[in-house]
């Protein structure tokens, strides 16, 4: 039963995160600072993400006619680490860059959220918080997601608040 729930959640993620591969990959500027490795150290940046998202949420969700698919089971269980790593990379490399084309009037807000999320992701990668094992499942999900269109971008951006909640849950589960 658990494997069916996890499998169903992963398949749903693949659908809504699919976006155009024409988007440029994310670039991250690496600073010579030591990352914060405690989940509570991410609270301020997550709050900043939520505040920015709240300003643009009506626009992003206006065209989203799908139900919420990024449920809490996604980051729990044996694949949670790999799923969170894949989700964050997907948002930074594909969803946010494609969002610039889908929502040109929201470029400032999207760039702000992307920059903050990049900072969180970079710190997490330098900490043991995302030390994952086998990525073969995520690799298959990624290949499937690449076949989607702008609907994946719209869905991904409209559910940013859910992503932020799942990220927070994940960070707290790694204490």
Swiss-Prot record:
GO CC annotation terms, alphabetical: extracellular space
Origin: domain of life: Viruses
Subcellular localization(s) per the UniProt record: Secreted
Pfam families for this protein: IL10
Signal peptide residue numbers: 1-19
SS bonds (residue pairs): 37-127, 81-132
PROSITE patterns tied to this protein: INTERLEUKIN_10 (PS00520)
MF term (GO), any: cytokine activity
Glycosylation sites: 151
InterPro entries: 4_helix_cytokine-like_core, IL-10/19/20/24/26, IL-10_add_hlx, IL-10_CS
Keywords linked to the UniProt accession: Cytokine, Disulfide bond, Evasion of host immunity by viral interleukin-like protein, Glycoprotein, Host-virus interaction, Inhibition of host innate immune response by virus, Inhibition of host interferon signaling pathway by virus, Interferon antiviral system evasion, Modulation of host dendritic cell activity by virus, Secreted, Signal, Viral immunoevasion
Biological role stated in the UniProt entry: Functional viral IL-10 homolog. Can bind to the human IL-10 receptor and compete with human IL-10 for binding sites. Requires both subunits of the human IL-10 receptor complex to induce signal transduction events and biological activities. IL-10 signaling pathway has several immunosuppressive activities that are exploited by the virus. Inhibits TLR-induced type I interferon production in host plasmacytoid dendritic cells.
Subunit comment: Homodimer; disulfide-linked.
Record-given protein name: Viral interleukin-10 homolog
Organism per entry: Human cytomegalovirus (strain AD169) (HHV-5)
């Amino acid at each position: 039963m658990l494997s069916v729930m996890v499998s169903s959640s992963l398949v749903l993620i693949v659908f809504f995160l699919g976006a155009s591969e024409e988007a440029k990959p994310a670039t991250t500027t690496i600073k010579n600072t030591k990352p914060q490795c405690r989940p509570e150290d991410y609270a301020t940046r997550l709050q900043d993400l939520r505040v920015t998202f709240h300003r643009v949420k009506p626009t992003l969700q206006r065209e989203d006619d799908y139900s919420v698919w990024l449920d809490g089971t996604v980051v729990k269980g044996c694949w949670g680490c790999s799923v969170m790593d894949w989700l964050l990379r997907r948002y930074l490399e594909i969803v946010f860059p494609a969002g610039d084309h889908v929502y040109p009037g929201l470029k400032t807000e999207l760039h702000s959220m992307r920059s903050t999320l990049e900072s969180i992701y970079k710190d997490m990668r330098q900490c043991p918080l995302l030390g994952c094992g086998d990525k073969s499942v995520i690799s298959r999900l990624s290949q499937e997601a690449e076949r989607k269109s702008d609907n994946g971008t719209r869905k991904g951006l409209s559910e940013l608040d859910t992503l932020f909640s799942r990220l927070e849950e994940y960070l707290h589960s790694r204490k």
